[in-house]
């Protein structure tokens, strides 16, 4: 495996792991604050990011690389609102997309077409993830501080997402 690409993939392992643990913290906050639907959404998102990380680890090792299991940054334990959760969610997904795009660019620069091909799955995933994050944040922005709207958002969150975008 090309060393520069291996480093980028290991960096991506860390980004996926950090997203997973941060989404777990968000799920815990939502659970503790009575937002059971939002909690289930973020528990599922956390698991999905963990699976993305595992897929990368396996790929690196299968390609005779050395996958590095990262130290995880401490997530924020307290959030101010549902809007803050979903603003962070969107920013996180945009960041991950940018990193994946950088990996793709470097794969083309180094003519590493095998990794480029592998990363196309992540490109598709990120299109979906950003779309979901934007849609949910847009809905929360429409709702504003209306408690009834927040209640309905929490109740219906897992039915608002098209089936192909539902976290596995």
Predicted regions: what they are:
Residues 1-168:
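Iron-associated oxidoreductase/ferritin-like identity signal
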């Amino acid at each position: 495996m090309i060393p520069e690409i291996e480093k980028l993939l290991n960096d991506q392992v860390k980004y996926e792991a950090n997203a997973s643990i941060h989404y777990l913290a968000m799920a815990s906050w939502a659970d503790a604050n009575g937002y059971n639907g939002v909690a289930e959404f973020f528990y599922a998102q956390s698991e999905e990011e963990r699976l993305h990380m595992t897929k990368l680890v396996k790929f690196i090792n299968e390609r005779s690389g050395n996958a590095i299991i990262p130290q995880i940054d401490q997530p924020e334990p307290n959030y101010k609102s549902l809007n803050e959760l979903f603003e962070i969610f969107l920013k996180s997904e945009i960041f991950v997309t940018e990193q994946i795009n950088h990996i793709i660019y470097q794969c083309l620069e180094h003519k590493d077409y095998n990794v480029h091909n592998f990363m196309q799955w992540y490109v598709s995933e990120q299109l979906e993830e950003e779309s979901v994050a934007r849609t949910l944040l847009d809905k929360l922005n429409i709702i504003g501080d209306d408690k009834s709207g927040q209640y309905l958002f929490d109740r219906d969150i897992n039915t608002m997402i098209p089936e192909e975008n539902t976290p596995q």
